[in-house]
Amino acid sequence: MRQGVLLPMGLVVMGAWFNAAHAQSYPLKPVRIVVPYAAGGPYDEIVRTLGQRLTEIWGQAVVVENRGGAGGNIGADVVAKAAPDGYTLLLGNAGPITVNPTLVKKLPYDPQRDFVPVSMVNASRMVLSVHPSLPAKNVKELMALARANPGRLNYGSSGVGNLQHLGMELLRIQAGVTMNHVPYKGAAPAFVDLISGQVDLMFANIVGTLPHVRTARVRAVAVSTATRSPLLPDVPSVAETYKGFDIPTWSGIFAPAGTSRDIVAKLNGDIIKVLQRADLKERYAQQGSEATPSTPEALAEHVRKETVMYAGVIKAAKVNAE
């Protein structure tokens, strides 16, 4: 009886030892991080800055691979179906992780089942800006204007179902106002029409908005996160008027489900070490972003809560991207 018990226990101990030893030597070859968007977007610089510093620690290359399409779903699906060995990772964000599970009817993966959270990487803000001819100087005045003119104000976004769109819908719902959504194929044409007065307002990322604010072509009335931005310290957050409003743009590292806990722990520790470096924080700050290292558990909880929040907005606003 004792031998029958000891043999399986020995195998368990050996397996645990092997996993721990494997994690300590990880990585033994280049690590691929998939960005689920076309090259040249804002997440490229975020992940390349991270990857360069991980390469210094590991002595192994970090290869950034852009796999754009379907709102981030194609790249995310590539990682969901990859071997769970730590050598293929996803730089995930709200689109493929917390929005698309509700927005897309036939998603080829389940974000909370098919991925293991590793660490949050960065977070940034959107800016709510208006055409200068609009009399509103803050979000309270803006929503009062919309309430007094139901269906008269038009807001732009870079497409249906993205954070610019959903952020405005959440604000509209919380304020109890009616506005018209005008989707564009990207932020650039939306800004052209905002500056020319074809649309009245829009949410957009802070880096893309700042040049237009500084040249007074648009007026910033609020930022989308719970706290103000160091880049626009005089611009209040929406949450100062509508409590609980918090729509950050963010990214995090995810591994395929089944990746060993030891490798996830090694990745998490090294990513946190890199994100705490002063040179990386400065680099991110130049892009209007903040390094936001986290535990895997904290990222998992963020994903869970945000998925519920966006599901509520999508259903309440009857958003349909298909």
What are these regions (language model features)?
Residues 1-9, 20:
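Bacterial N-terminal signal peptides that target proteins for export
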Residues 12-22:
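C-terminal segment of classical bacterial N-terminal signal peptides
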Residues 22-113, 152, 160, 176-200, ...:
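N-terminal (or domain-start) structured segment
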Residues 28-30, 174, 214, 261-322:
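An extracytoplasmic/periplasmic, membrane-proximal ligand-sensing/linker region
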Residues 42, 46, 50, 75, ...:
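Hydrophobic alpha-helical segments typical of transmembrane helices
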Residues 48, 52, 56, 77, ...:
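Solvent-exposed, polar/charged alpha-helical surfaces in well-ordered, non-transmembrane soluble domains
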Residues 81-87, 102-189, 238, 243, ...:
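Hinge/capping helix and adjacent helix->loop/strand transition within the periplasmic-binding protein
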Residues 97-106, 170-174, 201-234:
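A ligand-binding cleft/hinge motif common to bilobed small-molecule-binding domains
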